Design a protein with these regions (language model features):
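ABC ATP-binding cassette signature C-motif
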Residues: 1-173
Length: 173
């Protein structure tokens, strides 16, 4: 119940829970319900809306620049400025290391190279829980709420998770 209160899923019968509006919470529940046609890797790759938007905008601006021939125009330079701003923001959000971070996290939790490309809905509940845990970890929330996270992990994955969480700089419950 405490985890659900902190996550904002339940409301307290008495008192209040205060947290900054910008506070990101990652909550791993025991009842994972994922039925995605995406591969495990794609599921995680699309889990950060800000990066997905930035990646899309970078592609759009790059495509527009490739098609233009007015290299000396103000509009062309404005697009270059926008591209620079988008690249800067993408870099600040670790966009250039995002896919590597996903693969490293999934492998740390026991997924093989082949399984990264396997559709998520073909996995058992325990493996879906690992994918959901990986999604939380790669998105680096301010607060991580874990409800029995090691239930479906083997010893190697538990050890990897312990090492990861020891380095985590946010709040962990």
């Amino acid at each position: 119940t405490l985890l659900r209160l902190v996550a904002g899923i339940n409301t307290p019968s008495e008192g209040k829970i205060h947290k900054p509006k910008s506070c990101k919470i990652g909550f791993l529940t025991q009842d994972i319900k994922i039925d995605s046609q995406l591969s495990v890797f794609e599921y995680l790759n699309q889990s950060n809306p800000e990066l997905t938007h930035l990646r899309s905008e970078l592609d759009r601006v790059n495509n527009e620049l490739v098609q233009r021939e007015d290299y000396e125009s103000r509009a062309y330079f404005d697009l270059l400025d926008l591209l620079n701003d988008l690249n800067h923001s993408f870099n600040l959000h670790d966009g250039y290391s995002w896919e590597e971070k996903i693969a490293t996290t999934l492998k740390g939790l026991g997924f093989s190279d082949e399984e990264l490309n396997q559709r998520l809905n073909t996995f058992s509940g325990g493996w879906k829980m690992r994918a959901e845990l990986a999604k939380i970890l790669v998105n680096q929330p301010d607060i991580i709420l874990l409800d029995e996270p090691t239930n479906h992990l083997d010893i190697i994955s538990i050890s990897w998770l312990e090492n990861y969480l020891q380095k985590f700089e946010g709040c962990l419950l």
